[in-house]
């Protein structure tokens, strides 16, 4: 079997101008980045913004193994299959972060015969969005430090600056740094740190903004620090929201590429799902909905993180609500949740599949709490056995959830036909009746408690002293009516990554909150979630290279 990059490089790409004709996008609607990549113009976005939206399909997953369960691959394969059965379909995905690409992932543009192309470009610098976000974030840091250096008219307490610098790499050495050293000419010394770019609030803002004016307003509302009297300092106080918007004026436009089968793909934005809301941009999803009859999109990690945030944070900003949710499951992940060691996941173990089904079952029940029908997609692997597949199908039948085996990695669109037909049946039955888990009027404590007890299956929430103090402070500032974005491990329903399956009776501990008032949500930190990842012992970068003719090697 060819590697992902070998498959990608064997495909004869069509000019992007030709690919997008099928959804009504013309040459003059594009800002080209070579032959195969483009940004969609605001003229076209505005032209279709009042059109009736099509059907929306959200792809999510069970709590994953470290390798992931193939949401992007399944999303791409499903979109290709929907097109193959005659449904005009677009896909809306997140952009990969270079840090994980060079670290553990090696690439994030799908896999096998379900990829978006050109995958080398998408995984590396693409159209420069990540660089623009990094630059805007760090320009804010520089302007903030300069304000303090030039007299600090706002009375900013340097001990209470909460804005960090970013870089789009995994670099643990930058988590905690000291800036301003070297004497008076080099600024005021203070503690600082770096996050990875996709953890930046500016990434979240870019993905929730509906136009340039909304982007500017959200940037103005970012809290960067506190004064000596403990009142918040916003970007608007520094009067720099215009400059930041200028840096992002092109990055806000969605990117257009294609799948192996020529499905138009909007790939735009990529906030982390365990520390941010984990969804591609509202602009990309909304525009796809108005251009196509079916739009397939995804939300990061398991349904307890990405899907909950998609439904509680992103959906209220969309022109329609999901008509179906596809939950990707693998037999290896179910066996892991059933107690099998990671080294033994390729061995047949029907009982472990049955034991691990509790994890998938809870995700199905959770999606139904939002009033949306679920479909289970079994992402097929070579090591899967007929007995294991039969057991999983039987268990799905018992809870009355449609289930289909999909082999899109190996067989592309053909491997997703059964799944596509089932999804269409569910969507056209029109049983979706979306409702949020909580209302804006609920307090932050009430919102978190609902997520913990109704989605995670936990017993209660413990707020540490710092978090309790912040709750009082945030209520005074009027931030308590914002949605909650939970930051926790993706591997478990709990805040303990080793508590697998569908645990009950546990407590979730909130150690502190991070206000993301520009993005419009409050992040609740649990456990030891890192905003700057480190590299593994053998990073994927060690296998990467480029040939004399410029061909990329080692991306996967």
UniProtKB/Swiss-Prot annotation:
GO molecular function: ATP binding; formate-tetrahydrofolate ligase activity
Catalytic activity, reaction form: (6S)-5,6,7,8-tetrahydrofolate + formate + ATP = (6R)-10-formyltetrahydrofolate + ADP + phosphate
Gene3D superfamilies in UniProt: Domain 2, N(10)-formyltetrahydrofolate synthetase (3.30.1510.10), Formyltetrahydrofolate synthetase, domain 3 (3.10.410.10), P-loop containing nucleotide triphosphate hydrolases (3.40.50.300)
Presence of keyword Nucleotide-binding: yes
Pathway it works in: One-carbon metabolism; tetrahydrofolate interconversion
Domain of life: Bacteria
UniProt EC number: 6.3.4.3
Record has Signal as a keyword: no
Pfam families (UniProt xref): FTHFS (PF01268)
Keywords linked to the UniProt accession: ATP-binding, Ligase, Nucleotide-binding, One-carbon metabolism
CDD domains assigned to the protein according to its UniProt record, in alphabetical order: FTHFS
Similarity comment text for this entry: Belongs to the formate--tetrahydrofolate ligase family.
Name of the featured protein: Formate--tetrahydrofolate ligase
Organism for this UniProt entry: Streptococcus thermophilus (strain ATCC BAA-491 / LMD-9)
